[in-house]
Amino acid sequence: MKRYFNMLAVSVLCSGVMLSSCTDDIQIGTLDESQYDNVKELKGAVRDANNGKTSTIVELRKKDYSTAVEFRLSRVPKQGVDVTISFDAEYLDTYNAEHGTSFKLYPADKVQIQHDGKIVMAPDDKSSYSLDLIIPTLGTDEFEEDQTYLLPLKAEVKTDGVSVSKKESHCVYLVKNLAGEGNTDRKPGEKETFFFFEVNDTNPLNALQWKMEDGRYLVNYMVLFAANINYDREKGEVYIYTNPQVSYILAHNEEVIQPLRKRGIKVLLGLLGNHDESGLAQLSEIGARDFAQKIAAMCYAYNLDGVNFDDEYSKDPDLNNPLFARPSTVAGARLMFETKKAMPDKYVTTFQYGYMGGEDYVDGIEAGAWIDIAVANYGSKGRPMAGMTKANCSGQSTEMARYGAIAVSTAKDVAESEYGYYMVFAPWAANNQGSKTQFGYLSNLSEGLYGCRLIEPKFYYPTTTSLKTNPY
């Protein structure tokens, strides 16, 4: 894994300006202030107080989900502001129509909002105090397994002079009921791990062998590395290519992927360039929209938790092809934006390398709305973009395949930082000395992040069998 001035003309121009200023009357107080209207306007928005986002994925197992909501203003209001945050059942149809989804409505009578959703902001408050929000887990008779339920909250301002757009007035929670004995929960303030599994060498099920002394699993997010973006010249379309190992894992979804998910490990499809003119950061808007639909279709078909983008190994595109564009951070951001739009209840993550992860906005929407996690290259820290914080980024990255070592102190530095993730690439898991050495480093990671070491594995899962399948 791995960017004269022509002094005579200026003089003449300045002279012209000076001469005209001598003959024209000086006008005072005629400044057009309309250009500052947006600066003066007082705007509001409702957000999740913990992550600052308008859309949050919630996975329910055996415990209720607790978070908080708050109302934010673009500037100090200089007056008291009254706000009410409430459940908005009517927003379901609007949301589904905008995203092409078929989510169901989370039961309104189960939602618990502190103080009945009422907020009073002081004249010098830009952000309100937080209101606790409880999303209870429900029984299987009320809650279908793996069905996404929309919990839409709406902010209504009772005070004149505060404008709230339709989009900024809503904060949604995409709630899933996940059956199984999930045990990857982190305590408040604890960081999460983000692993890339080189599936050509390592069976993903080995993540179940890395269990901490307190009974929790070490791996939070697992990227199946990797499927590829490719171009079919005969059909004239961009598609997802899966090599024999990735094909086998997808075909044996219930035996390989779902056991991980049922224990709380989020499984993501890795996407990588593959030595042709298609590339993750060189698709046109049309090309990005089409490819995003293919990504979403695959994630839904195989019940994956999302996708990770890695912009490497692509050739220069044919700019006469309407599916392609010049490689750029703008094109990379467009693909992530379209992918999140196509599957809002899935995770969209990026390896901040090449042209992926370098734009703050797409169509005026900040990156935090369409990037869930950004992990950095080795020796670097993730860079939060608009709408993101360090908590959405990795604070350290280690490549195990090249004998990358992890010290307890390194992991502890991340644990004590503002960053939210520790990234590990290509860990081995086999009955050999190299894997045993790596296991010691992973145990150091566990101790540094969580204060306890890993339990020695009793066996390892062998590498998966190859299987050739058709491109998706």
Located regions from the model:
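Bacterial N-terminal signal peptides that target proteins for export
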Residues: 1-9
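Hydrophobic alpha-helical transmembrane signal-anchor segments
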Residues: 9-15
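C-terminal motif of bacterial Sec signal peptides marking the signal peptidase cleavage site
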Residues: 17-21
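Secreted glycan hydrolases and related glycan-binding modules that recognize and/or cleave
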Residues: 23-82, 88-110, 120-472
